[in-house]
């Protein structure tokens, strides 16, 4: 093949690439949604560094203006999972609990502490997370403050899961392609689809997920997205202004049960718990939050802090089939916390992750 022919093919390929992006942007501006396949193809281009900043800015804003639907979110998430560093394990029925963040509540690290307690309760927890974006302390910040190695290789992470029932996958390490979008995301200074993709792109593809969202309108599309991605059991929650199961008011829930989706409301009484104010769960920096987590794991936690962990782990036990109901799960977690056994799990995680 001549050099001129190769150059012509490259030009043709570039023109086709630009045309498909332009078509997608015009489609979105016309208020027409992208298909799962279109979205996945576009995000493959982003993850592989093949989209210019101007094209990416236009695409993200056009998506945001129209409003992302589940097929668009699922296509983007599938692309990110496919382009991620692989994580393999012999364990099955993996679970994760996390939130989108962005609710402005700055609580203690509830889902991260809950993940350690859930591991102590016999659930295979693969926590996928990052450093703080919208709060005082992200999951990675807390785990590092507790002495856990947050930058394990995939082999080390798999070993940690198999030895302790818990592991951590540090998002920047597993999703190198996201760096291609960082400049645009920083410059735009507004929420985009990337703000909701974090909880959906765990490289372990967990079968069970407890996912908190900052806006109740995201509950249903996120459940539909997880169904498309193959998740078996999930609860998408928004608790009275927070991306958590609330203790200070009602929680909107959309539950995914092997393809079936149902919607309902939960209150603390559904866990046999009293109500607590959001102020009672206020967190600070990583070291303060780590001390709070240590107290909880040692069985010396504040009542409100314990309650926040109980509702999350109870939901995970229910979703994993290890509790008959949320109340049954809550009683199991209360007993576990009182025993201080969860501290043994943390110590094992610290030892194995640094080994």
From Swiss-Prot:
Question: Binding residues for anthranilate 1, per the UniProt record?
Answer: 99, 130
Summarize where Mg(2+) 1 binds, as residue positions. Answer: 111, 244
Class in the EC hierarchy, top level = transferase
Q: In which pathway does it act?
A: Amino-acid biosynthesis; L-tryptophan biosynthesis; L-tryptophan from chorismate: step 2/5
Taxonomy, superkingdom: Bacteria
Q: Could you tell me which InterPro entries the record lists for this protein?
A: Anthranilate_Pribosyl_Tfrase, Glycosyl_Trfase_fam3, Glycosyl_Trfase_fam3_N_dom, Glycosyl_Trfase_fam3_N_dom_sf, Nuc_phospho_transferase
| Reactions mediated catalytically | N-(5-phospho-beta-D-ribosyl)anthranilate + diphosphate = 5-phospho-alpha-D-ribose 1-diphosphate + anthranilate
What Gene Ontology terms describe where this protein resides (cellular component)? cytosol
Transmembrane portions of the chain: none
Positions contributing to 5-phospho-alpha-D-ribose 1-diphosphate binding = 99, 102-103, 107, 109-112, 127-135, 139
Q: How is the cofactor bound?
A: Binds 2 magnesium ions per monomer.
Q: Which UniProt keywords apply?
A: Amino-acid biosynthesis, Aromatic amino acid biosynthesis, Glycosyltransferase, Magnesium, Metal-binding, Transferase, Tryptophan biosynthesis
Requisite cofactors: Mg(2+)
UniProt family annotation: Belongs to the anthranilate phosphoribosyltransferase family.
Q: How does it assemble?
A: Homodimer.
**Its biological purpose:** Catalyzes the transfer of the phosphoribosyl group of 5-phosphorylribose-1-pyrophosphate (PRPP) to anthranilate to yield N-(5'-phosphoribosyl)-anthranilate (PRA).
What's the protein name? Anthranilate phosphoribosyltransferase
Organism of provenance: Pseudoalteromonas translucida (strain TAC 125)
């Amino acid at each position: 093949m001549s050099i001129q022919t190769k150059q012509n093919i490259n030009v043709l390929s570039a023109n086709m690439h630009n045309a498909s992006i332009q078509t997608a942007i015009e489609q979105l501006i016309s208020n027409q949604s992208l298909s799962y396949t279109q979205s996945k193809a576009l995000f493959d281009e982003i993850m592989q560094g093949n989209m210019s900043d101007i094209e990416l800015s236009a695409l993200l804003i056009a998506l945001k203006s129209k409003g992302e639907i589940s097929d668009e979110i699922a296509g983007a998430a599938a692309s990110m999972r496919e382009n991620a560093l692989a994580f393999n394990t012999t364990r099955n029925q993996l679970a994760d609990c996390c939130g989108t963040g962005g609710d402005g509540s700055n609580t203690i690290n509830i889902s991260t502490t809950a993940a350690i307690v859930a591991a102590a309760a016999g659930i295979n927890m693969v926590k996928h997370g990052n450093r703080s974006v919208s709060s005082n302390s992200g999951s990675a910040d807390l785990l590092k403050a507790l002495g856990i190695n947050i930058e394990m290789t995939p082999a080390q992470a798999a070993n940690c899961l198999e030895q302790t029932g818990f592991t951590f996958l540090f998002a920047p390490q597993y999703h190198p392609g996201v760096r291609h979008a960082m400049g645009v995301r920083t410059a735009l200074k507004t929420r985009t689809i990337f703000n909701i993709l974090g909880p959906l792109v765990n490289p372990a593809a967990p079968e069970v997920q407890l996912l908190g969202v900052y806006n109740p309108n995201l509950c249903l599309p996120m459940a539909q997205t997880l169904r498309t991605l193959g998740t078996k059991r999930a609860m998408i929650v928004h608790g009275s202004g927070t991306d958590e199961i609330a203790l200070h008011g009602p929680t909107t829930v959309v539950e995914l049960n092997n393809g079936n989706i149902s919607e309902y409301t939960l209150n603390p009484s559904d866990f046999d718990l009293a109500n607590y104010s959001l102020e009672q769960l206020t967190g600070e920096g990583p070291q303060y939050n780590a001390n709070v987590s240590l107290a909880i794991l040692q069985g010396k936690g504040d009542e409100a802090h314990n309650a926040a962990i109980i509702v999350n782990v109870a939901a995970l036990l229910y979703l994993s089939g290890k509790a008959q109901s949320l109340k049954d799960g809550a009683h199991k977690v209360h007993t576990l916390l009182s025993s201080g056994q969860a501290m043994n799990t943390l110590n094992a995680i610290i030892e194995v992750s640094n080994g």
